[in-house]
Amino acid sequence: MPVAQGDLDATSNAEFYNPHGVLGGHLGIGKHADTATIRVLRPLAKSVTILTQDGEYPMTHEYNGVFVVTVPASGTKKQPTIPDYRVRTEWESGAVLIEDDPYRYMPTVGDMDTYLFGEGRHEKLWETLGAHVLRYDDPMGGADGTPGEQVVGTAFSVWAPNAHAVRVVGNFNAWDGRRHAMRELGSSGVWEIFIPGIGAGETYKFQILNANYTWEMKADPMERQHEVPPSTASIVTESTYKWNDDAWMQHRRTTNPHDGPVSIYEVHAGSWKQGLTYRDLAKQLVDYVKQEGFTHVEFMPLAQHPFSGSWGYQVTGYYAVDSRLGSPDDFRYLVDQFHQAGIGVIMDWVPAHFPKDAFALGRFDGTPLYEDPDPLRGEHPEWGTYVFNFGRREVRNFLVANALFWLEDLHVDALRVDAVSSMLYLDYSREPGHWRPNIYGGRENLEAIDFLKEATATAYKNNPGVMVIAEESTAWPGITAPTSAGGIGFGMKWNMGWMHDTLEYLHEEPINRKWHHNEITFSMVYAYSEHYVLPISHDEVVYGKGSLYGKMPGDDWQKLAGVRSMFAYQWAHPGKKLSFMGNELAQWGEWDHDASIDWDCLNWQEHRQVQTMVADLNAFYKAHPALWSQDFDPAGFQWLTSDDADHNTLSFLRIGTKGETLAVVVNFSGEAWSDYQVALPTGGKWTEVFTTDDAKYGGSDIHNGTFEAVEGEYHSRPFSAKITVPALGVVFLKPED
């Protein structure tokens, strides 16, 4: 079967878009229909022989490293087929190698896969693109001809629509891509090859002849494992993990977490305790989070990122977990252990932007492929990163499928989406004249809005029981409204206003707080405009902002009491809860990603007592639906007294869906108030059921026990009682059933 000289020349240089059309086996036509012509590329080989079940066929050097031979076809006269074969190569050194031929295999990516990807609708993209270990039964045995074995190999595929040629390189071909040129699948822009003999653990990259006719090495955008930085190659991986969280996943599918208790322990995995792996964390961190009573753990990004100083927020491998801490199956084990302990796992997800590292996504095929081609939209001036092209179907598919990958393949229970504000606004962090309006002349990023709606809607549709949470700092309306009602579709968003006002207020000396009382009450004006998470996150205890302990004024006792009252006020306020690691210890110093949190402070009893209070507060919180069952419904909250600025005190009711009621009294002054009159909705006996001032928490041990609410209108309530409210303390009161 003759081949055009131009195609042969391009194939010999591994620069042909369809090497499978030249190399491998091809049936003859006409009177030669009972034969097959086989070509292989073996530059510098001394001799090459084709081995079939019927015999050995020495090949002839045809052109520039291309060898050719014609052999008898298999099958029948009416339906001839290419015979199974292996290639024996003898090199000038005398070494002899028997191996299978990548170019005898059909495409491993189907037409439906490329169609769905082109339409932006392939919801299992990670099962198609990237590197996948496959096994085939073959009468000639394994890839090296070993009888009785399966052919084990890896299917590689990558999207590079503007590339002129793509090769796979790795240790298996001495990083010489001429042996493994890929074929382009029609007009899809997807390149593919199956390479027999390659299994899990092999490192690889794609060598791309880009739009500028320059060869570049790129890591796989769909890699599911990556070398430990600073190395930059992808790794073929095959999961052998057997999940043991069926009960958790079944419960997840049948439960709405938005209506349940959510208290989140935010963690930077590399610095909670330095030097731990995913397997180590599966013991130590799981036990600790369970001990402290949090319902969920939230990890700062654990997708692959080259620069540890980015804290994970500059991602290069969206489908790979951070290799510094272990393998993908090690990460699965960590998630599994959390689930078996009854703890949900939240992952920070960064679809807004990506770094410019040359080995990664940027200018992937020599053009702005993943990033927006408009420089006024495609680069983030503040972070020095590229912004995704949210208007391109394949890019949106890459990101939406990635969200599903974390939720489905890795069993993560929720995504916290980073930097949503930067996606919503075209002028975000840009000077006048350095941004381009949308088609209507506005500042809204219409393509990003559509992407976010698609991502949230798809996540919730495909995975009942998950949460998708926005880190969004503006007043954009409808962030947590359903897409069917014109909203963005998030389940919750961080309440940055509450966080800012609360920390500003608590930073004031108690004697000055009366002049700032509006800061601590203002959050209830808009508390139900969205579904909120109340965050005291990593961003508030870094870059000179000080630790939570350090933000509190006063002496050591007052600082610790301030931390305790801060936690209790946060846990009592409508909205789900989030606190960063170290806050529960009242650690002295602010967070440093290059060091562990201040575990040494637990050598002091006072800090152990704060840690104990947080554990007890979480247990109390989970046991009382009044504190969580109506977080997003105004019926779950009523003010008792909001205007007692002179005493730095506020009181309110939390009410559950089944009528459970708790009264909460918060004293942010430095003095205890005896005979403090509290308005109450019902008479009879009330009992103090939790106080931050208990001696076991390091408090002054003021208690109110059980007392009687007496009739008589006070602050528009029919009953009231006089209690003692501890300095810098919070008390929870419950009526007798």
Curated annotation (Swiss-Prot):
Keyword tRNA processing in annotation: no
Protein name: 1,4-alpha-glucan branching enzyme GlgB
Family, per entry: Belongs to the glycosyl hydrolase 13 family. GlgB subfamily.
Catalyzed chemical reaction(s): Transfers a segment of a (1->4)-alpha-D-glucan chain to a primary hydroxy group in a similar glucan chain
Alphabetical list of Pfam families matching this protein: Alpha-amylase, Alpha-amylase_C, CBM_48, GlgB_N
GO MF entry, a single one: cation binding
Source lineage: Bacteria, Bacillati, Actinomycetota, Actinomycetes, Bifidobacteriales
Active-site residues, as the UniProt record annotates them: 418 (nucleophile), 471 (proton donor)
Subunit structure: Monomer.
HAMAP family attached to this UniProt entry: GlgB
Organism: Bifidobacterium longum (strain NCC 2705)
Matching Gene3D superfamilies: Glycosidases, Golgi alpha-mannosidase II, Immunoglobulins
Gene that this sequence comes from: glgB
